[in-house]
Curated annotation (Swiss-Prot):
It catalyses: [ThiS sulfur-carrier protein]-C-terminal-Gly-aminoethanethioate + 2-iminoacetate + 1-deoxy-D-xylulose 5-phosphate = [ThiS sulfur-carrier protein]-C-terminal Gly-Gly + 2-[(2R,5Z)-2-carboxy-4-methylthiazol-5(2H)-ylidene]ethyl phosphate + 2 H2O + H(+). Gene3D superfamilies: Aldolase class I (3.20.20.70). It comes from the Bacteria. 1-deoxy-D-xylulose 5-phosphate binds at residues 161, 187-188, 209-210. Homotetramer. Forms heterodimers with either ThiH or ThiS. One of its GO terms (cellular component) is cytoplasm. GO terms for molecular function: thiazole synthase activity. This is Thiazole synthase. The gene is thiG. The active site is at 100 (schiff-base intermediate with dxp). Disulfide bonds: none annotated.
Amino acid sequence: MQPLIIAGRSYASRLLVGTGKYQDFEQTRLAVEASGAEIVTVAIRRTNIGQDAGQPSLLDALPPSKYTYLPNTAGCYTAEDAIRTLRLARELLDGHALVKLEVLGDAESLYPNVAETIKAAEVLVKEGFQVMVYTSDDPIAAKQLEDIGCVAVMPLASLIGSGMGILNPWNLQIIIDRLTVPVIVDAGVGTASDATIAMELGCDAVLMNTAIAGASDPVLMASAMKKAVEAGREAFLAGRMPKKIYRASPSSPTSGLISGSK
């Protein structure tokens, strides 16, 4: 199967996972291992990756030699805050350029503020960041972000942490069809079938956190999500049969049937 390519780098796994909301770093480690993910996203404002030398660091549980870190701007509500946060991340991670940009509109819905997101993306791309960007499922905004130079566009399936699944597959399909950079569903996945549907639509990957960390058994759910993403990708590549309302053809041979007459 073809690898996922982001900013010129190849990844075998098409599942990206967050690192927040777990009981501790050990549970984080076990869940990430079970997911098979190679890219892990981390909220710079909430997680210790070296800011506090006296506290446990995520870097010890998930060594950068094994995983690609994707610093994100969770908790940022303005372009300026997001830019400042990612500049700090680059310092903490020794010049790391691959980042996830998210600028939120409000604290209740966590819906993206697209105008502020575009403003931040323009600055970050000019500064040499490789920007993977969280956005709405608006195809026009998605295309604008690609044109700015973002290396991946990450439309929501539904609101962050809602677990509502894919609410607007039609808009996602338009984005997938129009963009040339990877399209990664980010936010709203609740269970394995949601991840499979996203991949069957043709998404290049799926990113999730709460769907795994919020499960009764996060490690088992991580394993389920790994399989779901793989199954969805294979189904997309295989090509599904056409949908039919009632003109179905029998799946069993029709020749050589035993006559019903005596």
